[in-house]
Amino acid sequence: MNVRLKRARELAGYAVQLTKDEGLPTMLKRGAGFVRRRCFGKRARYLPAKKVLEAQRAEMAGKTAADCGLPTISILTPLYNTPEKYLREFLDSFVNQTAPNGQLCLADASDAEHADVKRIVEEYQTKYQRIVYRKIENKGIAANTNAAAELATGEYLALADHDDILAPHAMYTMGKAILQLRAQGEPDGFLYSDEALFSKSIQRPMVAHFKPDYAPDYLLCCNYICHLAVFQKALWDEIGGERPECDGSQDHDLFLRLVEKTGGAAHVPQVLYYWRVHAGSTSGGTDAKPYVAAAAKKVLADHLARTGRTGTVEDGLFPSTYRVKWDIVGDPKVSILIPNKDHTDDLEKCLHSIWTKTSWENFEVIVIENNSTDPATFTYYKEARQRYDGLQVVNYPQKGFNFSGINNFGRQYASGDYLLLLNNDVEVRNADWLTELLRQCAHPGGAAICGAELLYPDETLQHAGVVTGLGGYAGHSHKYRKAGGSGYMFRAATVQDFSAVTGACLLVKTSVWDEVGGLDEAFAVAFNDVDFCLRVRDAGYRIAWTPYAQLTHYESKSRGGDEKDPVKARRFAAEQQRLYAVHGKANILHDPYYNPNLTMDREDFSESNDLRGLKEGRITVQWRK
């Protein structure tokens, strides 16, 4: 099918579903935003406004790297038979920086037929002393990068390819970000920015890669950091630079070895690097460089060995992605908690799928009976206990529905090392679902919580992680996208770090549950899972999501929201406000695993209508572990 036609059909389907769920006015509002972005917001949309760049130049006028007040950053760039057009555009992007704190270190391994590379560089050197150059023998990308590093005199290093373009404010922004980290008392050893892909001109970028803050599980699935990465030269020297045996994935290897030393990284949500897409570049996919995949798996296996963890590294669901199948430590028992009121057809489907499909054997199931009124329900419980060996049914003593209270009550009967909160209207799809949830938690350095991929019966995504701030409070990642897709930057097809996952299927270490006090019963219906995950995150633990645990969620796409019932609407509004009161509105609206340049109105990871942070050159940075 023609790609444009396919995309048009997908958008039409999304518009129809959005109209059903949230009404015509909402659909029209979002549609208008989409048209604005596509038709009127393309040119130079990721660059700061001209007046911002002029202000930066004015601030730095007459200053040198020594007295500009910014840390010096030496950019390492191996050259190899670089086309003149690409080389001049790259060199121009360096000399036209708004701040003088950069040094460009060029190691030229071009062959004799490309002597023009040296001539062009020397032409620039006569005008700009901040460019240093050495002709070298070609020993591969890592060794050539190491040769460039030998020329560096800066406190920090950065990596740049010879055919790409630096944003004009790259050195200024990274220098200011380092100073900001120091002022905040945070580690300043390793930073990275966002990037954009382009073909002909950075005035017309193709797409931006708006990245999350440091996400360790994501980094083990793909090198999402890429460009522009800046790190202390002392760290580079300590770890020995890049490893030639990792050519093809040498930067990924470097970043993993850096975070082994720093314990984390800082993210600057500004587009500071433009990655050229052309035949032979990795920005066009690893099909252009097949050796990358083999190198990446070696890099990941080496990282596991250095950090004392065990698992198998495999190809991921898509090219350029990978999967660590962690070895599960011991034989942890999982207590599955399922609240239920009547709805025995749903419950039977859920229980039958657990007992007939689950490959992990060490589990118990506790159904928490919550005020059922149909006598047939209790007959069903009696029959189910006979049919499903070890099934427990416990009676919640309170009246009304309080999801938090029901699960807190059920925990009293659980004997597992892990608790699994599970809705009664889900059905297991793959045999290893529980094993895969455990893989993310039951190993040294694992997450405390892991969520699953939940699909609607029509094979669209219901849940692929929770993003706080969407719609003002919280929303689901990639909701309504067709199953089997990669999502934004592979984020629907790789293990992810999130601030929260849905309580419809949530695995948590029992010790962590007890440490934070279980679910907050003031959140009776809404946001109890979000609040719980945020308290776990704030206690220093990670929350992961895996696409390798899949369940069908029979929650209706078109079910009425709480806002349609006045009583429920008041309760929902109160729980919304409590979420702000407990965690702070600013924290809810700024999810570290969701870039501020992405939309807050939709659940599709599309670009925001509001890119003022980019246009103003706003510098915000926070280190995360």
Specify the residue positions occupied by each region the protein language model found.
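Glycine-rich, basic loop-to-helix element that forms the pyrophosphate-binding segment
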Residues: I136-A152, Y396-A414
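C-terminal, non-catalytic tails of nucleotide-sugar-dependent glycosyltransferases
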Residues: N2, K6, E10-C68, K289-D331, ...
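Short, acidic, metal-binding catalytic loop of nucleotide-sugar glycosyltransferases
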Residues: D92-N101, H352-N362
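Active-site donor/metal-binding and catalytic loop motifs
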Residues: P269-T286, G316-Y322, L455, E521, ...
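Conserved donor NDP-sugar-binding/catalytic core segment of glycosyltransferases
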Residues: H169-P205, V426-Y473
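Short beta-strand-to-loop acidic/aromatic patch adjacent to the donor-nucleotide binding site
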Residues: G154-I165, G416-R429
